[in-house]
Amino acid sequence: MELEYPDDLRYLDSHEYIRLDGEIATIGLSAHAIDELGDIVFLELPEEGDAIVVGETFGSIESVKAVEDLYAPISGTVIDRNEALIQSPEMVSEDPYEEGWFIKVRVDNLDDEMLAETMTAEEYRLQVAGEE
């Protein structure tokens, strides 16, 4: 099965994705990372109002295989978290990009340097192909 990597997202080396809509960023984990992790059993996410800092951990995801930290692709304030995933973390495996997002963040200061640390979908496809 070929995994999808939507073109409207930016990706990190650590496999998080970011979808920008003005000053609001939706953050989740790529289909590749979720496929590698296997069945997701627990998700730890920040609360609304919490600050996240680019490059630092903002939560963790636990599967039957491993526990992995989640890294912030941008800095900002959490304005929403996907409560449905807290109750049913396995949902992230079913649809990581639409229903399986983790948090929404009001971005502090988005600049080109910050986005330079991310990859396009095509660049990300090439990276994950090299990992296999």
Swiss-Prot record:
BP GO annotations: glycine decarboxylation via glycine cleavage system
A Pfam family of this chain: GCV_H
Methyltransferase as UniProt keyword: no
Cofactor: (R)-lipoate
N6-lipoyllysine carried by residues: K65
Keywords assigned by UniProt, alphabetized: Lipoyl
CDD domains: GCS_H (cd06848)
GO cellular component terms attached to this protein's record: cytosol; glycine cleavage complex
UniProt cofactor note: Binds 1 lipoyl cofactor covalently.
Gene3D superfamilies in UniProt: 2.40.50.100
Domain annotation Lipoyl-binding: ranges: 24-106
PROSITE patterns: BIOTINYL_LIPOYL (PS50968), LIPOYL (PS00189)
Keyword ATP-binding: no
NCBIfam families xref list: gcvH, PRK01202.1
Subunit structure, interactors included: The glycine cleavage system is composed of four proteins: P, T, L and H.
Its biological purpose: The glycine cleavage system catalyzes the degradation of glycine. The H protein shuttles the methylamine group of glycine from the P protein to the T protein.
PANTHER family: GLYCINE CLEAVAGE SYSTEM H PROTEIN, GLYCINE CLEAVAGE SYSTEM H PROTEIN-RELATED
Family named by the database record: Belongs to the GcvH family.
Name of the protein in its database record: Glycine cleavage system H protein
Taxonomic lineage from the root: Bacteria, Bacillati, Cyanobacteriota, Cyanophyceae, Oscillatoriophycideae
